[in-house]
Amino acid sequence: MQRKDFVSIVTKGVKVNISLHWWAALLGLALAIGLILRKLNTTYALMLGAVVGCVIGGATLSQTVDIVVSGTQSVMGTVVRVLAAGVLAGVMMESGVANRIAQTIVVTFGEKLAIFALALATMVICAVGVFIPVAVLIVAPIAIEVGSKMHVSKLALLVALSGGGKAGNIISPNPNTIAAASGFDIQPSAVMVSSFIPALFGLGMAVLLATLVQHRGQVVTMDDLNGGENASAKSGGKASRELPSIGRAMVAPAIAVVLLLINPLGSVLGIKALTMFQVDAMYILPFAAIVGLLAMGQGRRILDYTKAGIARMIDMVMILIGAGALGGLITSSDLPDQIVRLITAAGVPGALLAPIAGILMAAATASTSTGVILGASSFGETILAFGTTPVAAAVTMQAGATVIDALPHGNYFHVSAKSMNMSIGERLGVLPFEALIGLTMTVVAVVLNIVF
């Protein structure tokens, strides 16, 4: 497979033909990572890396603007869907729905299956549209209470919570799934359905690892609740208020899941009437949230919850814009070609480029969503040129992005550490187990979507 000698960039009708050096893209990426590690705002770090990479790669100032603008325009579809998902996220987090679901799952399974229940609770909460850091904050107080009674270590509890969250994250209508779907021009529901079995394997691995290490490390106590700074209230604001019943709490997520699955299930079952239902997640997620809110009798709170939801999405949207800019730099260079040559020379099948890109980009940015959008925007065309289907590419890239995405230069590392009152050293000890969980999901995703 050969690449053209130039890259065509179209911005507002202006076409610029330019090819940047691969090393300039790497330097821009390295600069962005370095600035993130130095605690510069992630969006600015990504954009500055893109600008510097373009300039040193041979682009003029005008061409640099075109590259950056073109890159950011490429993620606008994702941005719109993420903002729409904010309505559902606001309702799930602020109304007490997520708290009720978590409590119900843990109470149902009891102490004998406590580790499984905690992992499953985090998985389900993520799967219905709650961000993984918030899901961990919601379940952490319950985990600490149960763990202190059973003398379970902090390590085991966070492995269960983080692993369950990772499993739920790849089958959720969260930004990472939306980014993976948009990057390969498919519906988020297709990614969610195809990621379900890998997610189950991830859940199983999380429970297995947490069970094996439940007596390793410092045992959690009720005093550790203070380390989360009232995490329950912070994550949902419903600690001191009456939670909705489980029946009413399930209305919003149930409607969202059912409507999202109609089209892909129709394709699988060969039912033409179902395949004709092609309503985008941009409509489904806010609709499900509003219906769920009315079912709970909290319709009057819609302005408060939507405001809270979009506030939680703003940071993610800004990061996506920065990632789009950096993606514009990479796609305007011959870096994808160089990586393809390297993979070919090493004898690695080209079909594995999707999960490899997910792993590397997520590690670089310490973010699943940012890793996916960078991987898709930078290597999407190259991946598809190897014959990988869009669904397989999206699913395996997203799974790969869960392997080493929880590094110290990202927000999740510190939020999850605080939820369990862990030191930095203790939190670092969780990383190998998180990587094993993510790797398990990646291998299963590759086997199901690429090998067979």
Could you tell me what each predicted segment is?
Residues 38-42, 76-78, 89-99, 126-138, ...:
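Short helix-coil transition sites and intra-membrane helix breaks within transmembrane domains
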Residues 83-84, 108-142, 321-323, 346-386, ...:
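Hydrophobic alpha-helical transmembrane segments of multi-pass integral membrane proteins
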Residues 16, 144-249, 389, 412-448, ...:
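Membrane-core helix-loop-helix motifs of multi-pass transport proteins
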Residues 112-125, 150-170, 191-194, 200, ...:
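Alpha-helical transmembrane segments of multi-pass membrane proteins
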Residues 20-23, 73-78, 105-120, 147-157, ...:
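Membrane-interfacial loop-to-helix junctions in multi-pass transporters
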Residues 87, 100-102, 133-146, 174-184, ...:
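Re-entrant/interfacial helical elements at transmembrane boundaries that shape
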